[in-house]
Every structure is written in C-alpha cells, then in structure tokens.
Amino acid sequence: MIAHPEPLHIVIAGDRGVLPGLEALVYSTMRHNRDVVWHLLTMDIQVDHADGTGTGYYGISEEEAGWLRKIVTFMDHRSAFIRHDIRELYDRYLAQSVNRETGFTPYTALRLLMDKVLDTDRCLYLDADIIVQGDLRPPYEQWGHADYDYAAYTIPDACDGYGEMVAAVLVFNLDRIRYSGFLERARRYYNRNLYRYPDQMALRDAGDPAPLEETYNYMRDHKLADGKPVVLHFSNCNRYKLYTVPPGEFYRYYPEHKYIKDGLDVIRSVH
C-alpha cells in the first residue's frame, strides 16, 4: 500500500470580490502541491460606520466555492476544499473591534480565528493576492511543529529597524497555540488597540514570529528576482493585484503567468 503524506492544510479568506485572486492562487498552488485540504473562511456581513452609513460584503457562495473545489479535485483527486461560514464566530469574537473604521475589510481579520475553526494541529494561511511557484511543504514542516506559535516573513530594518511582519503568508502551530493562548491575545489586541494594519499588528504584538524566508513571501518586483521565489505576493511593489483589474490586463503585463488563465479555461471546458 502506498503511504500518502499528511495533508497540507491551507487557509484562505475573502468575499466575492477576491474570487479571481483565489482561483489563481488555488490553481497555481495545486500545480506544485498534492494532498492539500483547503479551508475557505467567508461570510456575508454589513459593517456599520460611525456616520450612520454601512458597507455590505457578500461572502463566497456555495456555488462559487464549488468552482474552487473543482479546480482542486481536477488537479489532484486526493485533495479537498471546505467552505466555512464563520459569521457566528466573527460576531462573537471580532465584531466589536475598534478597528472597524480602518478601511480594511472584515475578512482580513478572519485569520485570527484559526484556533476556533480548524481542528488540525497546524495550518498555512495565504492571502488572495498570491501566486505559488513551488513546494509549500518545507515551511509547513519546519514551523508547523516548532517551538513557535507562528512563522512569518519580516521586512528587515522596516519600522525604524525593528522590522515589519507581513501577514500574507503565515504558518500557524495550532497545537501549541491552543495552550499558549497566542490567538486569544491577538484577538484581544485587535479588539482594543487601534492599528494602522489591524490584524497584522495584533499578531505581532501577541508574539514574535519564527523567521519565514523571503522566498515564501516575495514582495519585490518578481520580474527582477534572482532565481524563482516560491510565493509571489503582489504587494505595492508589483504593478497589479489580480483581483483589482480585469484578468486580461493582469496577464498582458505578466504573460509568464498566463498559464493560470489557460489552465482555468481547460477546467471550465470539461466541467
């Protein structure tokens, strides 16, 4: 009997607006990784503002999640995709945060609920503005069971030399977190302290991360990169985020990633 590796648990989050980014993330990840269990955190929600107005967000529906699931199972029949509607958990733990008016959507904070959603002992969180170009298991194996609560890339010498932790790619040691209370502290800071980058800074204040290598969160212009970074993070250093422009414009500027569009078209044609 062939022994299969332990599943790689990957968590993503977002509303309907980031679906183009998520499908590119899922496709590019599955091109290089097998035995993956995806966890999508989503919800419908309206955020009420101090001036009496409100902003409504639509979560990714079961039908839309079904399309992401088709991508996953088409590329690897042993992988799976699970949609988690976590509105109840959000209302219970995060809805009264002082950071509701910061301009970030509520979905950025959902990574603070990992210990309440998953029953696994570790997981890898990925933002929706990422393309994966290689194997994600090395950081998952290295830091998922290490003597740290989490691992993240930190920009050297940012923030007056202290370093700025970037929360786009995170390895969580959930087994350790459940007794250390790390995410419980992060939620408390997120709810009470007004931050520029709310959930990211709440995590950093709750505890220092293990050092994730830059190749797993490459934020600079990847057209100028030496070698091939494993994770491309389309931050402000890159021209476009995939989910903020029409896909055609993104792939015209980044023709090296058009294989994603072509691959998704093939999957659509057979389903």
Regions found by a protein language model. Give the residues of each.
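A glycosyltransferase accessory/donor-loop signature
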Residues: M1-V18, A24-L25, N33-R34, F172-H271
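Short internal beta-strands
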Residues: V37-I45
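Active-site-proximal specificity loops/subdomain of glycosyltransferases
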Residues: D48-K116
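Glycine/small-residue-rich pyrophosphate-binding loop that anchors the diphosphate of NDP-sugar donors
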Residues: P106, V166-V169, N173
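Short aromatic/hydrophobic "clamp" motif used to bind/position activated sugar donors
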Residues: C123
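Catalytic metal- and UDP-sugar-binding loop of GT-A-like glycosyltransferases, i.e.
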Residues: L126
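Conserved donor-nucleotide/metal-binding helix-loop-beta segment in metal-dependent transferases, i.e.
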Residues: I130-Y162
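Short, solvent-exposed loop/turn segments at the edges of secondary structure
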Residues: E164-A167, G227
